[in-house]
């Protein structure tokens, strides 16, 4: 049974759009995938967040920010609980909504990546792990099949 090559275009286009959409739609912003439960129930693992650049002066209590912890924890998204001056510099005290205590460090302007602009629930699952590999496989299989059909058609025309 020969597959209709037009049917192969549909999953190819969908897979490419799903992989490219976040980067095009939110160009200029930083896209991150939540991997922990520290911000439950607001942010769940596999949620995608869009982070816009911000400075500490723009932050308010209650904002969710992304920052580099410069420790083994890497990039973190937590809620601002206080913005204040310490030793002549503005700093931010943060806490995960699902954590009992505030973070044991202060976020400086150098650490700050930005403020969370939007949350896309569960969408991160298509950009990480097995689903991403499945989408890449769909793209490769569709492309190879379409090239094979194209070559076969061109040979039969000669």
Residue spans of the language-model regions?
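Protein maturation boundaries and topogenic segments
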Residues: 1-48, 53-54, 119-158
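Extracytoplasmic
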Residues: 27-29, 60-62, 75, 87-89, ...
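Conserved positions in beta-strands of structured domains
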Residues: 35, 78-84
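Structural motif
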Residues: 46-48, 60-63
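Short, charged beta-turn/beta-strand-edge "cap" motif at the junction between a beta-strand
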Residues: 54-58, 71-74
């Amino acid at each position: 049974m020969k597959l209709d090559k037009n049917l192969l275009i549909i999953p190819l286009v969908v897979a490419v759009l799903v992989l490219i959409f976040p980067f095009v739609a939110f160009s200029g912003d930083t896209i991150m995938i939540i991997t922990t439960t520290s911000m439950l129930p607001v942010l769940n693992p596999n949620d995608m967040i869009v982070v816009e650049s911000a400075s500490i002066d723009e932050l308010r209590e209650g904002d969710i920010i992304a920052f580099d912890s410069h420790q083994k924890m890497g990039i973190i998204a937590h809620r601002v609980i206080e913005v204040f001056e310490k030793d002549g510099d503005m700093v931010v005290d943060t806490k995960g909504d699902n954590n009992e205590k505030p973070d044991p460090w202060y976020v400086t302007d150098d650490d700050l990546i930005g403020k969370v602009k939007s949350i896309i629930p569960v969408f991160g699952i298509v950009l990480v792990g097995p689903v991403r590999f499945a989408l890449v496989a769909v793209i490769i299989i569709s492309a190879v099949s379409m090239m094979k059909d194209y070559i076969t058609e061109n040979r039969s025309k000669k």
